[in-house]
Structures are given as structure tokens and as C-alpha cells.
Amino acid sequence: MTQFEKLDLLLRECGGTIQTFQVLNNGISKSVFYAYVKERGLEQASHGVYVSPDTWTDAMYLLHLRCGQAVFSHETALFFHDLTDREPLKYTITVRTGYNPSRLQEDGFQVYTVKKDLHEIGITTMLTSFGHSVPAYDMERTICDLLRSRKNIEMQVFQDALKQYAKRKDKNLRVLMKYAAMFHVEKILRPYLEVLL
């Protein structure tokens, strides 16, 4: 099997998206890989990420590959959890404080930052419409994030999401209140819950 055939197989196994580190881990040099990229007409989606020209582009998955610490949050997480019927105009992510989000913002993403110890709270895995796994915050964390960012969020979006959450059988009010205390939004959240529950 030639190295190009190995790369063809790897590209198929990875669903048409391949990263340079995967190539190197399979014992193929960068120079061979770059010749393959040119020969097969692969497009560079971001640094170290290449996509086959006949593959549908999964923007969410590419964003995840581009910025591994990014977690889909706010309106995008609402959409993942069916807590809104509005498809987000731009994807919203949260990264740790200290990460420079300027390039992501220039590319049209809404980026929030949070302290490192709060970044990992409530992370779950969701599937994009293309079937790729990406990190997103759970419903309870998303509601707390919306309250923390309420100056940047339409109040109607938050209220509709909370109404949808209250109807859900898989809601976890204990976790919601725990997160609300951690994120200092308990006093704001409680009156809404008293009306809905």
C-alpha cells in the first residue's frame, strides 16, 4: 500500500476531514502529506485541518478541531438541547480566560470567556447535524450562562428557553440550583422558577 493509498484510507475513516497530527501519527511525513493535499485538492479549513473537496463542511466540527477548548454555549447550546426554535445566526462558544479570541471573533463567532475552574462545569457531548461529536454545555449550565450574559441576550430568548426547560422530563432542578449558586445567579433565577414550576 502506497502512502497516498494510506492517506486515502485515513481520509475516508475520518469522514473527509483530516488533521496533520493524524497523518504524522500514522508514520507519514509532512512533505508527503502536503504533496497529497495538492494532488487530491484538499482544502485547508484551518491550521492543521484539511477537508476533502467532496465532503460537506461541518462548521461546528471544524470550529471544535480549530479550538479544542471551545465549548458550544448560550444560544447554540439552546439549539442543541431544543430549548429554542431559533437557529443561531452565529455560533456561540465559551473558552477559558487567557485565550485570545480575536481570530474567532473576526471569523464571526460569538466568544465568551470564563475562569478556568468554571470552564469544565456542565460539559456534555452533542452531535452536529453531520453526526460529529462536539462539546456543549448541558441545559442547566446553559440557563445559568444566559443569566450571566443577560445584557447580551434577548430576554424573550431566555424566557422561552426556561419555559421549554420547565416542560422537560429530563430537567434536573437540583443541578440547576447548584450551578446557579456557583455562577452567582441564584437570586435572579429563583423568581422565574417560582412562576414556572
Task: Please identify what each model-predicted range represents.
Residues 1, 19-21, 26:
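Conserved short "hinge" loops at termini or chain/domain junctions
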Residues 1-16:
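Short amphipathic alpha-helical interface segments
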Residues 40-46:
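A short, conserved structural fragment
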Residues 6, 17-22, 49-197:
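Nucleic-acid-binding surface
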